[in-house]
């Protein structure tokens, strides 16, 4: 706030630079006696364009202000008004008035220093006193605005922090946003997992092998595969939709590489194997029993590696596994439970797409994508869908799709299949319908062939008809429903 200074003191602004004290006194002396005329100058002793005039009689000052305000003096309109004291004066020292023409902070500062011998604060006159007592005019001019940018007082410090805080906060927000997003995108790239599951899949990153499929290592990570199981299924579903086969195929073909060298052979062989199937007229499943299953049996230690993941994987997707391994003859499963852990989602997807149980799907699809040879999926699918190849395979092996489970290591899958399937049921509700009873349905040991669990005959009936149609043989049903020991073992003897 500014208050009126000496009642007889006037501020005259907007003066011509050529106007001096004598001229001012001559002009304003007409209104009454003048006690003092103060023209503000810069260092070079040039007028800064404003002055203070003190009348001996305050009434004369008022009259002069009314008469001369807005009048032209030496070619310039001047402003005349009662001089005001600045509210921020300190120690009796007052800020000098500023001219509306001199709005530059540097100009104000220089002129103040020149006339007063330097300044210490943001007020030019704080270091020295004015002859007129430091009175300032009551102006609504840019007088103070010209000086504000250069002031170094507490007010500038108090005003400064908010911008400083806002900028870092914006940076921090952007940094924090980028920090949270980076890993999710990376995880999503690696695993195809929806963002909501990214946090745990990153843990999975650490536990899994460096390969992006990350499902097939024998290093005991498969107890952690439950997390993988939790997150891989969606990725499975995506992969299956995009590529026509599940990641399980990828993991079968890639993951088995980690399990056994024999797996590797089978994994790399599939394309030629697909041709071999066409040449020999038997399905991938048959070939897996004639070749792949031998590999599996020759490497039972592979199955020994898998149990940790089997326990977990089988609990989650055991039912689906059972179907798959049932339909696939455990060909890939003994060596990699991990694959079994990831297949169910994709099987569930296939089940929805094809409208029949996973059993039917595998029967009709010929285990093409369950075999773990994703590259041969389309080819194997078409080949296996042809009834002739399977009929030949069935006749050759003396058993249908059901015999392979006799060879599969059923005991390791145990009854844990169904109760762990509850997790999968939440995520894959429809798949549960098709797999629920099958979880306990096959409880096969390698030596005891495919004994059905009497608890779930309904799903057996639901599952069996399509395989029968797909293969053109009822030996599948016989081997499963009747226990199939003689028949499936006959198939084994024919194979081996």
Swiss-Prot record:
Signal peptide start and end residues: none
Residue ranges of the region described as Disordered: 67-349, 452-496
Extent of Basic and acidic residues compositional bias: 204-214, 242-253, 276-289, 313-326, 335-349, 484-496
SMART domains documented for this protein: RRM (SM00360)
GO CC annotation: nucleolus; nucleoplasm; nucleus; spliceosomal complex
Biased composition (Polar residues): 175-184
Principal location class: nucleus
Molecular function, one GO term: RNA binding
The RRM domain, residue ranges: 8-85
Tissue spec: Testis-specific.
Domain of life per record: Eukaryota
Ranges annotated as biased composition (Low complexity): 97-114, 149-159
Assigned keywords, A-Z: mRNA processing, mRNA splicing, Nucleus, RNA-binding
Subcellular location: Nucleus
Pfam families linked: RBM1CTR (PF08081), RRM_1 (PF00076)
PROSITE patterns from the UniProt entry: RRM
GO biological process, one term: mRNA processing
Quaternary state and interactors: Interacts with splicing factor proteins SFRS3/SRP20, TRA2B/SFRS10, KHDRBS1/SAM68 and KHDRBS3.
Note: The RBMY1 proteins are encoded by repeated regions of the Y chromosome, mostly within the AZFb region. The exact number of functional copies is unclear and may vary between individuals, and some of them may represent pseudogenes. The proteins are very similar, which makes the characterization of each protein difficult. Thus, most experiments do not discriminate between the different members. One can therefore suppose that reported interactions with a RBMY1 protein involve all the proteins.
Protein's job: RNA-binding protein which may be involved in spermatogenesis. Required for sperm development, possibly by participating in pre-mRNA splicing in the testis.
Record protein name field: RNA-binding motif protein, Y chromosome, family 1 member B
Organism, as annotated: Homo sapiens (Human)
Biological classification of the source: Eukaryota, Metazoa, Chordata, Craniata, Vertebrata
């Amino acid at each position: 706030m500014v208050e009126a200074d000496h009642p007889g003191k006037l501020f005259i602004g907007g003066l011509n630079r050529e106007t001096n004290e004598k001229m001012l006194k001559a002009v304003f002396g007409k209104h009454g006696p003048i006690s003092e005329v103060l023209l503000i100058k810069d260092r070079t002793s040039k007028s800064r364009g404003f002055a203070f005039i003190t009348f001996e009689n305050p009434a004369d000052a008022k009259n002069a202000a009314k008469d001369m305000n807005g009048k032209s003096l030496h070619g310039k309109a001047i402003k005349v008004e009662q001089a005001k004291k600045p509210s921020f004066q300190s120690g009796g020292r007052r800020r000098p008035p500023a001219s509306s023409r001199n709005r530059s902070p540097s100009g104000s500062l220089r002129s103040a220093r020149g006339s007063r011998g330097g300044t210490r604060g943001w007020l030019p006159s704080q270091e020295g006193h004015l002859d007129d007592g430091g009175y300032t005019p009551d102006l609504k001019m840019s007088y103070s605005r010209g000086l504000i940018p250069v002031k170094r007082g507490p007010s500038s410090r108090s005003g400064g922090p908010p911008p400083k805080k806002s900028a870092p906060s914006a940076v921090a927000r952007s940094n924090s946003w980028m920090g949270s997003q980076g890993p999710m995108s990376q995880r999503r790239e690696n695993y195809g997992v929806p963002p909501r599951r990214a946090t745990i899949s990153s843990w999975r990153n650490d536990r899994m092998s460096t390969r992006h499929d990350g499902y097939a290592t024998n290093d005991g990570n498969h107890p952690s595969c439950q997390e993988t199981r939790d997150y891989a299924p969606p990725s499975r579903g995506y992969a299956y939709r995009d590529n026509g086969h599940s990641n399980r195929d990828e993991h079968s073909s890639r993951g088995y590489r980690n399990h056994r060298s024999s797996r590797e052979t089978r994994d790399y062989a599939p394309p030629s194997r697909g041709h071999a199937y066409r040449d020999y007229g038997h399905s991938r499943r048959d070939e897996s029993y004639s070749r792949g299953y031998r590999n599996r049996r020759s490497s039972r230690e592979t199955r020994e590696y898998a149990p940790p993941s089997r326990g977990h994987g089988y609990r989650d997707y055991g039912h689906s596994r059972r179907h798959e391994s049932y339909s696939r003859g455990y060909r890939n499963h003994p060596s990699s439970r991990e694959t079994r852990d990831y297949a169910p989602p994709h099987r569930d997807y296939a089940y929805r797409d094809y409208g029949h149980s996973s059993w039917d799907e595998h029967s009709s699809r010929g285990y093409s994508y369950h075999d773990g040879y994703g590259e041969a999926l389309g080819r194997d699918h078409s080949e296996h869908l042809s009834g002739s190849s399977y009929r030949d395979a069935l006749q050759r092996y003396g058993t249908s799709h059901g015999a392979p489970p006799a060879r599969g290591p059923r005991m390791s899958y145990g009854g844990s299949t169904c109760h762990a399937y509850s997790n999968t049921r939440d995520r894959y509700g429809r798949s549960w319908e098709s797999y629920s009873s099958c979880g306990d349905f096959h409880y096969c040991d390698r030596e005891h062939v495919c004994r059905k669990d009497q608890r779930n005959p309904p799903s057996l009936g639901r599952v069996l008809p399509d395989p029968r149609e797909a293969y053109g043989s009822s030996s599948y049903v016989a081997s499963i429903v009747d226990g199939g020991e003689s028949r499936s073992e006959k198939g084994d003897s024919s194979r081996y």
